[in-house]
Amino acid sequence: MSHMRVMFDPKTIALIGATEKRGAVGRTILENLLRSKERKIFPVNPHTRKVLDVESYPAIAGVPEHVDLAVVATPARSVPGVVEECGRAGVEGVVIISAGFKEIGDEGTQLEKEIDRIRKKYGMRIMGPNCLGFVRPVLGLNATFLRGNPPPGNIAFISQSGALGSAILDWAVSAGIGFSMFASLGSMIDVDFGDMIDFLGDDGATRSILIYMEGVGNARKFMSAARGFARRKPIIILKPGRFAESARAAHSHTGAMAGDDSVYEAAFRRAGAVRVGEIAELFNAAQVLDSKKLPAG
């Protein structure tokens, strides 16, 4: 089984930065994870023996079972060391919720480079940093700090922006729109849109893919993946950057440079993806796709 498949269907999950502190990200993530009855959850916190009545461990090395997925919610400066510990423990996938990386400047960029060096050393996959995580309603798994779970459905939604992703998720819950996957990719140090399209293209629960994109990541990988699946599964993209204000806003969110918009426009067309211009159009696309009345062919 590939690292991506293990990452998105883990049997064992460690939450590094788990806490009982009310309002803390580490508490909300743990509460969400504990609702997944089919997975073993291991809180990691060196300062306590239990978190929310679940036995806690001082470090991932102390967890008594092999960990498939680690979710990291610790301060940015601690993250390289945490990722190193995950690598030593044989963890296959890491979701870094923590913020304070390239979006804040040079110091954060250096932290990302160190994390990427460690990732390559151990061959693990990393989502984030500065991301919300992912939700797989079809599996009853919520590895984010967002409240509310959308019902299971056939639409996958992928976003770089956490704020936009959160708004879409809130709307989907209120509208009863179902998702096969919700994923917030953040800074895309490793897992990017190409990886997600590859994974979702082969995912039996997914019939269509909606994307909010600030920067494409690995353009060649994205084009290859989109061309491979766009004919079978509609790929609909909202990408800001047609106007200067949109480009600046996108850059401030995740440190992603918007790039030449005409290049993106041509690339989406060649890949067979459909570009929409406004969030309302993305909502409308979700409603149409959720109706399960896709045109033949």
Where are these regions (language model features)?
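Catalytic-core regions of core metabolic enzymes
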Residues: 1-297
